[in-house]
């Protein structure tokens, strides 16, 4: 007797009193999958609406197995029952009112088979959009490739998710007490052990907007966010990050406050000519105010020294003023060559005595107290190569939210209001990015030395791009944080034109990397920094429900 091989995918759906038409559409979307290697495990968590039972009664098929609980136990209990009944290689999570794209499972299978080692693929996720009450799709969410820091700050993955069944079992399945955040909790635990994590950059799920859904009103589920906060705190404890976790200023966002190890010394390296300018109605020596704003913020866990690489031609008043402001914490490195930003930074770091170096432009002023400790907290993680800060123009708009390399080299969300959370909470969360500006960037001194510092082939422009990409090539993550913030009066102190020779160097060394940003998305418009989708990517209704309940697909 031949025993049938188990299916590749077990789609798990827990049901509790959805709109019957929405449930019918959900089930139908599974039935019309172009991939045939699946089963659908449905657990009804004691729905009270008899119409829901009628839909389930009529939904039976060879691939669908409907189980009914005797009493309502909540989504974790129902999900645990569904997992126990599943036999597939991967489990796929599908909410009872959401709709799969017809090729969803086929695309997941292709992603597994196309990996360098298919047997090592443990977690997959896709892009999604929202399914409006009028049946049209809207607001696609085009996600980055794997971004662990962002997942700690909020569940950017959400839907659609497939996880290797054996790994789900290894981490203990769905944990009781995390109802409402059970998926986020599972993703965090799975990610700690996953060998390969694959992002499929296609909209393969339509997330229903309904009265009870977080997709419609994130403020409806405070208990879910509290469960998510505990999930993040538990995750950080498991991976050895000493931190507290709070619910953030925006729904679904968590604020992580990391404790520093010991009392680190941070060398603030500032190259300057001693330039002056007028900002907010006052003439200033930029480097004086840059240093004074940090001195005024003293009292954190980090000790500061100020390594100022000062042009020998600068007015003597500049150095005298720095001495009064910084006192014994000041180290002056005289510089008598033609302007070369990379050389100045390298000279400053060579003279630095700190465990960490903060690369800082002179035309900055601290905006958020505690910024340096925030950056050190991230940089003390062994796999973090560099930490970038939020930079604001003097009018309060965003100058820097991380780099974007999508055919151009740009600042993410350039010009957005500085207090806006940004699309998909981008401006409100710590997250990986391909690079950050050296106008305010912190890294461990040994890491700077490991990758050879800044390139002398890039004296004026793109030196921070090159540094970022060298760090990533060495296996480090680059993290941007909104919790460290400076004013940046860019162009007030110095504005150097782009040198074609420097463009040629970046093209020679990083041709592929500046065109393929893993933290952007191929569905987004190239050459932009605002996460605008390419034309024609969303909006069509995926199906229509007729008066008799029949689902007709578009």
PLM-predicted stretches and their roles:
Residues 1-2, 220-263, 395, 407-433, ...:
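C-terminal, non-catalytic tails of nucleotide-sugar-dependent glycosyltransferases
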Residues 44-53, 71, 309-319, 365:
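A conserved acidic beta->alpha catalytic loop
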Residues 91, 357:
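Short aromatic/hydrophobic "clamp" motif used to bind/position activated sugar donors
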Residues 69-86, 335-352:
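Glycine-rich, basic loop-to-helix element that forms the pyrophosphate-binding segment
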Residues 103-138, 365-408:
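Conserved donor NDP-sugar-binding/catalytic core segment of glycosyltransferases
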Residues 76, 84, 137-166, 179, ...:
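A recurrent flexible, glycine/aromatic-enriched loop bordering the glycosyltransferase active site
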Residues 1-29, 241-293:
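N-proximal low-complexity "stem/linker" segments adjacent to membrane-targeting elements
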Residues 27-37, 289-303:
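Short, acidic, metal-binding catalytic loop of nucleotide-sugar glycosyltransferases
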């Amino acid at each position: 007797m031949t025993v049938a091989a188990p299916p590749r995918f077990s789609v798990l759906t827990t049901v509790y009193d959805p709109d019957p038409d929405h449930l019918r559409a959900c089930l139908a979307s599974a039935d019309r999958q172009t991939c045939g290697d699946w089963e659908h495990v449905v657990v009804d968590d004691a729905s009270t609406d008899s119409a829901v039972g009628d839909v389930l009664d009529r939904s039976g098929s060879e691939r669908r197995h409907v189980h009914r609980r005797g009493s309502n136990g909540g989504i974790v209990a129902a999900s645990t029952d569904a997992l126990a009944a599943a036999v597939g290689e991967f489990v796929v999570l599908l909410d009872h009112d959401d709709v799969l794209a017809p090729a969803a499972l086929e695309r997941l299978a292709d992603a597994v088979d196309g990996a360098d080692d298919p047997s090592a693929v443990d977690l997959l996720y896709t892009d999604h959009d929202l399914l409006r009450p009028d049946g049209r799709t809207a607001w696609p969410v085009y996600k980055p490739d794997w971004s662990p820091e962002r997942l700690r700050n909020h569940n950017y993955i959400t839907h659609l998710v497939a996880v290797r069944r054996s790994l789900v079992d290894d981490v203990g399945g769905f944990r009781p007490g995390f109802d409402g955040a059970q998926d986020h909790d599972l993703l965090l635990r799975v990610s700690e052990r996953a060998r390969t994590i694959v992002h499929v950059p296609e909209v393969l799920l339509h997330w229903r907007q309904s009265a009870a859904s977080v997709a419609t009103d994130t403020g409806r589920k405070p208990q879910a966010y509290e469960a998510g906060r505990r999930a993040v705190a538990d995750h950080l404890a498991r991976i050895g990050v000493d931190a507290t976790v709070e619910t953030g200023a925006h729904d679904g966002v968590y604020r992580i406050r990391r404790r520093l190890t010991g009392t680190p010394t941070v060398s603030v390296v500032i190259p300057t000519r001693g330039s002056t300018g007028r900002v907010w109605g006052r003439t200033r020596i930029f480097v004086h105010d840059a240093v004074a704003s940090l001195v005024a913020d003293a009292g954190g866990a980090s000790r500061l020294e100020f390594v100022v690489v000062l042009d020998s031609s600068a007015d003597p008043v500049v150095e005298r003023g720095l001495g009064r402001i910084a006192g014994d914490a000041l180290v002056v490195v005289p510089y008598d060559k033609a302007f070369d930003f990379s050389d100045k930074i390298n000279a400053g770091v060579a003279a630095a005595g700190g465990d960490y170096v903060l690369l800082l432009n002179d035309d900055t002023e601290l905006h958020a107290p505690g910024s340096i400790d925030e950056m050190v907290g991230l940089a003390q993680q062994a796999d973090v190569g560099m930490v970038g800060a939020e930079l604001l123009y003097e009018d309060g708009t965003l100058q820097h939210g991380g780099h974007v390399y999508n055919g151009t080299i740009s600042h993410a969300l350039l010009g957005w209001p500085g207090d806006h959370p940004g699309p998909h909470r981008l401006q409100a969360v710590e997250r990986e990015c391909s690079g950050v500006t050296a106008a305010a960037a912190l890294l461990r001194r040994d890491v700077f030395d490991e990758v050879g510092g800044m390139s002398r082939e890039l004296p004026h422009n793109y030196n921070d791009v090159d540094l970022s990409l060298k760090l990533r090539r060495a296996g480090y993550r680059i993290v941007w944080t909104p919790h460290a913030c400076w004013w940046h009066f860019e162009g007030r102190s110095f504005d150097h034109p782009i040198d074609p020779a420097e463009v040629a160097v970046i093209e020679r060394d990083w041709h592929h990397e500046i065109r393929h940003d893993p933290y952007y998305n191929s569905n987004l418009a190239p050459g932009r920094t605002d996460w605008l989708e390419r034309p024609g990517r969303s909006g069509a209704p995926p199906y229509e429900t007729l008066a008799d309940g029949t689902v007709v697909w578009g």
